[in-house]
């Protein structure tokens, strides 16, 4: 049985907890600011969290390093590569930290030997439409040169933003410029503040 309490303006009742058999807060993640406090908890893979939960049940003395064998890092819905695993370890141990997420940009070759770059993932919370708009502005302002065409071919199977290059342009040069001048590479800050027993607390991985 779950106890109920008044909500923030006392107009209705709400459950004091939302019970589940795994740490749902860690799976879904959370972010926001209220009453001078902020939280930023990244989402995680459900299967990995359940495996770690089972390992914790079997061994209550399991360490955070051992839990990280099951949960190596966050799992973002928009994909991307996490850079800086030491910073993830710091976040899991202390509840605070920051790491970089880099969207994946791959090379492809079109007919006629014209090369293209394809953005296949973007950092968490980066707006794809605004990213494309930013690239278009950089091309227009000649801060990135060598791009012939830019189009969004994303569908239900995933993200696919095609950047068609002019002949003779070095793809790696354009890719480096995209990482430098846009938020295809972005930072995510750990701040695992949660309410525990009606008090704010910074949680480490094991405390979730």
PLM feature spans:
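Intrinsically disordered, low-complexity regulatory segments
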Residues: 3-28, 33-208
């Amino acid at each position: 049985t779950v106890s109920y309490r008044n909500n923030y303006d006392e107009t209705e009742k709400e459950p004091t907890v939302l019970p589940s058999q795994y740490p749902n807060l860690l799976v879904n993640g959370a972010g926001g600011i209220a009453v001078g406090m902020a939280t930023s908890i990244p989402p995680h893979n459900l299967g990995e969290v359940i495996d770690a939960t089972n390992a914790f049940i079997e061994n209550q003395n399991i360490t955070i390093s051992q839990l990280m064998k099951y949960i190596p890092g966050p799992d973002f819905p928009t994909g991307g590569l996490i850079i800086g695993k030491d910073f993830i370890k710091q976040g899991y141990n202390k509840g605070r930290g920051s790491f970089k997420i880099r969207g994946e940009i791959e090379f492809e070759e079109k007919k006629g030997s014209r090369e293209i770059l394809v953005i296949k993932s973007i950092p968490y919370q980066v707006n794809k439409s605004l990213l494309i708009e930013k690239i278009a502005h950089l091309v227009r302002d000649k801060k990135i040169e060598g791009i012939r065409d830019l189009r969004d071919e994303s569908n239900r199977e995933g993200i696919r933003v095609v950047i068609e290059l002019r002949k003779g342009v070095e793809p790696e040069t354009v890719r480096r410029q995209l990482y430098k001048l846009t938020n295809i590479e972005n930072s995510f800050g750990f701040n695992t503040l949660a309410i525990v027993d009606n008090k704010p607390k910074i949680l480490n991985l094991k405390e979730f």
